[in-house]
Amino acid sequence: MDLFHRAQEPVNRELTWIKPFDNRMDEILRLKEKSETCPKEMKKVFLTAWAELASQVKLHQKVASGIVKSGLPLSVYYNVTLKTDMSSGTIDFLIISDELIVVVLFKTKEHIEWDRYDTRFAKLPEMKEVIAAEETACMLADWLSVNRALSSKELARVVPVLIDEDQDELSASAHPIERSEVFTGISKALEVKPDVFEKWLLENCEVSEFPVFIGQRLRKITDAVDQAVI
C-alpha cells in the first residue's frame, strides 16, 4: 500500500483557464476606429492608446503561449481585478501550480519628458513596478489567509513575477526564491523576459509528486479569488 498516495488527486490533470486569455481585439479595433473618426486634436491621444494596448496584448500573448506550451496542469486567471477588505489591484496572469501561486504583472515603459526633466538638480525617476508586484502579491496572500485558503506559513508560496522585455535569456533560470524585503511573508519579486516565461514555468512550477494546491485546497483558493473579483 502506498502510504503517501493522495486519494483526492485527479489521475489526469490539465491546464484550466478559469478566466480565459483574451486578445482584446474588440478594444483595439474600437480605439483604432476612434482615431480615424475623432476630431484632429484628439487623434494623437487615440493613436497612442491604440498602439500601447496592441503592444501590451502582444506581450501578454507571449506569456499565454508559454503557459500553454509548458504542458503543465495549471489553473489560470487572465486580467483579473481583485478588491479585498484591505486593497485592490489588477493581476495580468494569476497562475496556480502544484506548489506555487504566481502573480504575474508586466513592466511598463516609463515616459519621461526629458526636455522638462533637469537631471542636474534631481534624481532620475525610480521604477516602481517591482514594489507594485510585491504589493499585489501581498494583497492576494493576505486575502487567501483571511479566507483560510493559505496558512501563515504558506504565504511564501505566493510568488510575484514581473515580466520585463529588458531582461536577458538567463532570467528564466531557476533562482532561489527569497523573502520580500518589504512585505512580510511573501516571496521577493522575480523579473523574467517574456520570451522565456515557458522555461521559467518548467523550472519553477513543475509537476510535484505531492502537490499542495489540488482538489479541495485548490477549490478554497479559487473560491476566495472569485469572491474578490470585480
Tell where the protein language model's regions lie, with residue ranges.
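Surface-exposed interaction regions that form or flank ligand-binding interfaces
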Residues: M1-G89, I96-V102, E110-I230
